[in-house]
Amino acid sequence: MSQTFGNSSKYLFTSESVTEGHPDKICDQISDAVLDAIIAKDPTAHVACETAVTNGLVVVMGEITTSCYVEIPELVRGVIKDIGYIKPEYGFDDRTCGVLTSINRQSPDIALGVNKSQEAKSGQVDELDLTGAGDQGMMFGYACTETPEYMPLPISLAHRLSKRLAEVRKNGTLPYLRPDGKSQVTVEYHNGKAKRISSVVIGAQHDPDITTEKIQADIIRNVIKPIIPTNLLDENTEYYVNATGRFVVGGPVSDTGFTGRKILVDTYGGFARHGGGAFSGKDPTKVDRSACYMARYIAKNLVAAGLADRLEIQVAYVIGVAHPLSVSIETFNTARMNHEDILSIIQKHFDLRPEAIIRNLGLRRPIYRQTAAYGHLGRPELDLPWERLDKVDAIKATIESLSVSK
């Protein structure tokens, strides 16, 4: 077997994704649906919405401070219906599930620092200093040249497979499929470049009267082959479709789900580091979310400008303070400029204060539910502000000026 991820010339790396009907992803979508509904009416609302689903029950809880009202049970049932849990025989559906809510206001101790940052309390008048970070912590962003969307290949393919699994269910190509499902892709790398697909794993929930043989043949033909590039497949590529032989009972009937349980699926599939904070259900004053988006935006624009083939950025904050505590980068020996100059470019072109992030990326808008399944990053089918490459020309101009000055 090949050596694992590291500095070896040949290694395997695996990432997974899940469909929108996975229990944890149901929760993410509900939490972000609540956030979108509130922020559409009250853009400055403070929202921290958590969801749990289990057999026949949805619980929505959290801390929300807002001037508006939204009908949460109605939102919950709408999300469940959109996903496809609409038949009683699934054991969980939009009409018969119970919905409980337990919502409190944001802690006034937290609000003290978020609503008025330490900088503002000290008399600074820059309006971008007014909003303090919603929590302490470190956040990471990453980009690489492996795919057109500047994402690692394993997670990119895994997301596309999971999304395709939902598509063939919804469009009737494979009408016997049910909403729950997972995918996993193992890529073999040679000298840091993707060489071939070692294995593809699909778990697809299905009706009880379909044979394993039919499911396996249908999934390979209608899901895997249309997604995986043929030049990466060979006679040694292994396919695992419903490896236990049966996947009838799924969704919240078989597994309890929670918001924020799929943080690597949401980001880089384990290819880059993660600070530990989840995204869904959080308004953009929570740097767990907004700073991760900003870090991705920075990394993607720097890589697209040719500064490195792989770049990871870490940003750290303290609650109630606008300016980050630290900013650091790792380029994995692919940089075409020293790290000090790259950091100076980041400082020149990207403002990492929470209010600046919110304004520059336009984050006080109902744009979040669409990110709650199939990845928050590297989504070419969505017009996500943190995926835009609108800083590349300015970065290149700065690179030229630095070269001239030296």
From Swiss-Prot:
Pathway field: Amino-acid biosynthesis; S-adenosyl-L-methionine biosynthesis; S-adenosyl-L-methionine from L-methionine: step 1/1
Enzyme class name: transferase
InterPro entries on file: ADOMET_SYNTHASE_CS, S-AdoMet_synt_C, S-AdoMet_synt_central, S-AdoMet_synt_N, S-AdoMet_synthetase, S-AdoMet_synthetase_sfam
Pfam families associated with the record: S-AdoMet_synt_C, S-AdoMet_synt_M, S-AdoMet_synt_N
Listed cofactors: Mg(2+); K(+)
Residues at which K(+) binds: E50
Residue ranges of the region described as Flexible loop: 106-116
Annotated binding of ATP, by residue: H22, D180, G181, K182, R246, F247, D255, R261, K262, A278, K282
Assembly mode: Homotetramer; dimer of dimers.
Name of protein: S-adenosylmethionine synthase
Organism: Dehalococcoides mccartyi (strain ATCC BAA-2100 / JCM 16839 / KCTC 5957 / BAV1)
Lineage of producing organism: Bacteria, Bacillati, Chloroflexota, Dehalococcoidia, Dehalococcoidales
Protein encoded by which gene: metK
